[in-house]
């Protein structure tokens, strides 16, 4: 009996499944942990209803609710999402960007930044503008603020090696691409937070240009902690300071092809607000 060959479509599905599985198995530690926290937080939003605990109201970034006792919201709102659709879209958008960042800068640096200035600075910018300029109180949640922050950093790095792209006879600066995506996202998803995305993007530009890199922990301190705790030996998928693939925040630009890698994912971020 003649051997049967797998149809081309079936082979493509198998190949894509294998590539996806291989990619997921190579995700670094902090990226895995962040995705897991997002998923578990979504589960909590469902389970919490039976406990009379509204996770969204508890952890969303609500400008008028920010005070000394509720500063935790600055760190919780990126992990909380409006619904399963919102959760999946932000995971798909955020994972490749975060994975790239962690491989470039290390796990410990990623933890320090995403639980530090990458959350607090755009969050406080949003709260300040909402409360004192717009006199509004629109709650926001979701990881899309981080998506645009990382896209801003990628855009600046791309600009250093490829300053323009051409449409017809016009030269468009490459750094403007995420800004256009913020506008497009706001137009296609009216419930998304234009201000939240813009705050994240501005912080990403600041880090990409090097103005905010002083907020990153010094490498000598990271090496001291890694050595004392033997993090590389104890934690699987950990990326040490000496394993990172690039320099610190734009000091060593990547190639044009790699710098463009994060951009295609931006259109699916869809950060959303609580309520209408």
Curated annotation (Swiss-Prot):
Name under which the protein is recorded: Rhomboid-type serine protease 2
A GO CC annotation given for this chain: Golgi membrane
Gene: rbd-2
Lineage, top ranks: Eukaryota, Fungi, Dikarya, Ascomycota, Pezizomycotina
Membrane-spanning intervals of the chain: 27-47, 77-97, 109-129, 132-152, 175-195, 198-218
Principal cellular location given in the protein's record: Golgi
Catalytic activity: Cleaves type-1 transmembrane domains using a catalytic dyad composed of serine and histidine that are contributed by different transmembrane domains
Annotated family: Belongs to the peptidase S54 family.
GO biological process: proteolysis
EC number(s) from the headed UniProt entry: 3.4.21.105
Task performed by this protein: Probable rhomboid-type serine protease that catalyzes intramembrane proteolysis.
Catalytic residue positions: 144, 197
């Amino acid at each position: 009996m003649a051997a049967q060959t797998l149809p081309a479509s079936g082979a493509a599905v198998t190949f894509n499944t294998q590539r996806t599985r291989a990619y997921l198995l190579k995700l670094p530690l902090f990226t895995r942990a962040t995705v897991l926290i997002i998923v578990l937080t979504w589960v909590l939003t469902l389970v919490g209803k039976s406990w009379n605990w509204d996770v969204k109201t508890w952890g969303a970034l609500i400008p008028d609710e920010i005070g000394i006792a509720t500063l935790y919201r600055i760190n919780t709102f990126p992990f909380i999402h409006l619904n399963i659709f919102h959760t999946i879209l932000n995971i798909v958008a955020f994972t490749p960007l975060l994975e790239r960042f962690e491989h470039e800068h290390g796990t410990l640096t990623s933890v320090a930044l995403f639980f530090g200035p990458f959350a607090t600075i755009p969050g406080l910018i949003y709260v300040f503008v909402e409360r004192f300029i717009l006199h509004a109180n629109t709650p926001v949640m979701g990881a899309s603020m981080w998506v645009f922050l990382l896209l801003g950093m990628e855009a600046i790095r791309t600009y250093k090696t490829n300053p323009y792209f051409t449409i017809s006879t016009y030269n468009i600066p490459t750094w403007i691409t995420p800004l256009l995506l913020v506008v497009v996202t706001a137009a296609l998803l009216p419930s998304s937070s234009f201000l939240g995305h813009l705050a994240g993007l501005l912080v990403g530009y600041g880090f990409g240009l090097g103005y905010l890199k002083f907020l990153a922990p010094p490498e000598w301190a990271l090496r001291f902690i890694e050595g004392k705790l033997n993090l590389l030996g104890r934690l699987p998928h950990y990326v040490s300071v000496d394993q990172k693939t690039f320099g610190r925040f734009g000091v060593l630009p990547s190639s044009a092809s790699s710098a463009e890698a994060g951009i295609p994912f931006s259109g699916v971020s869809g950060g959303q607000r609580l309520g209408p």
